[in-house]
Amino acid sequence: NLNESRADLGFIASLPGRKILLRGNHDMFWDAKKTRLLNELYKGKLFFLQNNYFTYEDPSRNVHALVGTKGYCYEGKDTPEHFQKIVKREQERLRISFESAAADGYEHFIMFLHYPPTSIGEMESCFTRMAEEYGAELVVYSHCHGEARYQDSFLGEVNGVDYRLVSADYLNFRPEKIME
């Protein structure tokens, strides 16, 4: 729960730099109803990315909207009905992020997902189609752990979108610079 997470969130907030958090599959303290509260509690220190967007300006003064959601991919554990229910929910959350940013005039997007953008063996998904529809320049994702899983989804450019895996073990626990 949130009370149990306060010490960890406080530690992360105390670290230097901007911290934008995206919900993962183990983040039980955070549900969609708490996003606004979390952003109020940690204003200026942490930003919780869900059903919203974050503005990023690079050194060349290009402005991007950072959008994202947890996402979901099929790993063989779900019934088709349960899988589709979760994907539909996550797709809607991502659309809310894109639409909010677009309504505020943003044209450049960086998309974040916790899960890979496709299930194993898929050549597209609702998430990749949405990245293409809104013109996301980059999709950053994680969740793939262990060498056997690193190739589960896209790496590099596909249909004009750059896909980057940033799972900690894939990066040898070193931060990845994704933009200037």
Predicted regions and their residues:
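Short, solvent-exposed loop/turn segments at secondary-structure junctions
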Residues: 3, 118-121, 148
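Binuclear metal-dependent phosphoesterase catalytic core
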Residues: 56-60, 85, 132-134, 146-180
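Short, charged, surface-exposed secondary-structure boundary motifs
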Residues: 30-32, 140, 172-177
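Core catalytic region of metal-dependent phosphoesterases/phosphodiesterases
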Residues: 1-59, 123-136, 159-167
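Conserved catalytic scaffold of divalent metal-dependent phosphoesterases
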Residues: 32-122, 130
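N-terminal active-site segment of His-dependent metallophosphoesterases
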Residues: 1-17, 27-28, 77, 93-107, ...
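Active-site glycine-centered loops adjacent to acidic/histidine catalytic or metal-binding residues
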Residues: 24-25, 114, 142-143
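Short, Asp-centered acidic motifs that coordinate Mg2+ and/or phosphate
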Residues: 20, 108-110, 138
